[in-house]
């Protein structure tokens, strides 16, 4: 075991110096937690709770959808979302196909997002249904390899009453238009895709995510 400087100075005797981690893909932790604590809350947002089992179910459906769109092991799936509950199932669902997730700064403008999509070689992207996000995404995918855009709405995770009333009253933001040839919707995936993930051999050493730098001194690096 390597001896580090911080181990030599007042390291608590009852705290282990190393931890053993299981040799398994990242999504295996979600599957295990869903089996063990399936009915417990995983996320709570705007009064709506999603359990571990529900998030796993959504991740499996997303994985099946992506596989149906030709996503294979080693392909890149971009996530252009702010901090919404879509992120965990999209992340785990992408990983279940063997794909590598590329996280995109939700503050990016068209040119910045276009660079990252090109540089990473992403062929699918998840985006929030919002005037500030969806049109930017459609512009940014021009001259890239992206063939699939999944639009995620805030209403997907709202309590049913809030979602219905918010939609009727125009309180839930939505894109002014959708590019039909590449667009799919998050809620359709959850209702139409199978809840059992495709069987893909994923090595724990495979690349799970590409995280780009902030780009303060030049173009972001990933």
Task: Show where each model-derived region lies.
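Flexible, non-catalytic linker and terminal segments flanking ANL/adenylate-forming cores
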Residues: 1-23
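AMP-dependent adenylate-forming
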Residues: 3-8, 28-51
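Conserved AMP-binding/adenylate-forming core of the ANL superfamily
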Residues: 20-22, 39-84, 88-92, 109-114
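Residue-level signature of the cytosolic catalytic core of signaling kinases
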Residues: 22-26, 129, 182, 203
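Conserved S/T- and glycine-rich ATP-binding loop of Class I adenylate-forming
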Residues: 55, 77, 94, 125, ...
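Structural core segment of the AMP-binding/adenylate-forming
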Residues: 68-69, 96-188
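Conserved pre-ATP/AMP-binding loop-to-beta segment of ANL
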Residues: 174-212, 219
